[in-house]
Amino acid sequence: MILPEPIHKVILVIIELGILLGSLGVVLLTNIVYSALLLGLVFICISLLYLVLNADFVAAAQVLIYVGAVNVLTVFAVMLIDKPKNITLFSFSNVGDNITLGVCTSLFILLTIMIPDASWSEIYMTKQSTKFVEQGLTTDVQLIGSQLLTKFLLPFELLSILLLVALIGAITIARQERIVEIDDNKASESKEDLSLF
């Protein structure tokens, strides 16, 4: 953004105050949900700082990656830390597990059948045509997008799979901890009931 010098300084001071106050709130608040939301405010202020400095792509990436990650952090914080007292277990949990197993197995078999039949020459032609595509790209954002979807497509997809596996692992760990805690609570309640007699 091209702004007059006094307005530029005022905007920078406001953004820096947002970063400073948000960071203090993240560290000093005891509620994990409020801390995560203030961390989102800090990341938004940092993206505004990049926007003022004419780094449009970095500002957009900051919002998409970090603010999106803060939403996931909020969900994990509530899921892993704020555990409710009374939980009723769903008795048909094996049905859901079996359905998930069936869907994943069928997708695996489908991909195993379709991958050998794919015409890889079209993918080769796509790589060859990037020379012509890059000639029409004028901005840095277009060049970065072109590189992400041609040259760095495999690392980009592997990173998304890694993040998905981490998400599934965190959900599984949180679920197992809750089940163990419920079993411990039931055992302690039964001991208390026996001590009454």
Curated annotation (Swiss-Prot):
Give any GO molecular function from the UniProt entry. quinone binding
- What keywords are assigned to this protein? Chloroplast, Membrane, NAD, NADP, Plastid, Plastoquinone, Quinone, Thylakoid, Translocase, Transmembrane, Transmembrane helix, Transport
Q: Which residue ranges does UniProt annotate as crossing the membrane?
A: 10-30, 32-52, 61-81, 95-115, 153-173
Q: Which GO terms describe its cellular component?
A: chloroplast thylakoid membrane
The reaction(s) catalysed by this protein are: a plastoquinone + NADH + (n+1) H(+)(in) = a plastoquinol + NAD(+) + n H(+)(out); a plastoquinone + NADPH + (n+1) H(+)(in) = a plastoquinol + NADP(+) + n H(+)(out)
Which domain of life does the protein's organism represent?
A: Eukaryota
UniProt entry tagged with the keyword Cytoplasm: no
Indicate how the chain sits in the lipid bilayer.
Multi-pass membrane protein
Enzyme class, first EC level, given as a word? translocase
Q: Name one Pfam family in it.
A: Oxidored_q3
Q: What is its EC number?
A: 7.1.1.-
Establish whether keyword Repeat is in the entry.
no
**Where found in the cell?**
Plastid, Chloroplast thylakoid membrane
Q: What is its main location?
A: plastid
What is its quaternary makeup? NDH is composed of at least 16 different subunits, 5 of which are encoded in the nucleus.
What's the stated role of this polypeptide? Answer: NDH shuttles electrons from NAD(P)H:plastoquinone, via FMN and iron-sulfur (Fe-S) centers, to quinones in the photosynthetic chain and possibly in a chloroplast respiratory chain. The immediate electron acceptor for the enzyme in this species is believed to be plastoquinone. Couples the redox reaction to proton translocation, and thus conserves the redox energy in a proton gradient.
The Swiss-Prot or TrEMBL record describes its family as follows: Belongs to the complex I subunit 6 family.
Q: What is this protein called?
A: NAD(P)H-quinone oxidoreductase subunit 6, chloroplastic
Question: What species is given as this protein's source?
Answer: Angiopteris evecta (Mule's foot fern)
What are the leading ranks of the lineage?
Eukaryota, Viridiplantae, Streptophyta, Embryophyta, Tracheophyta
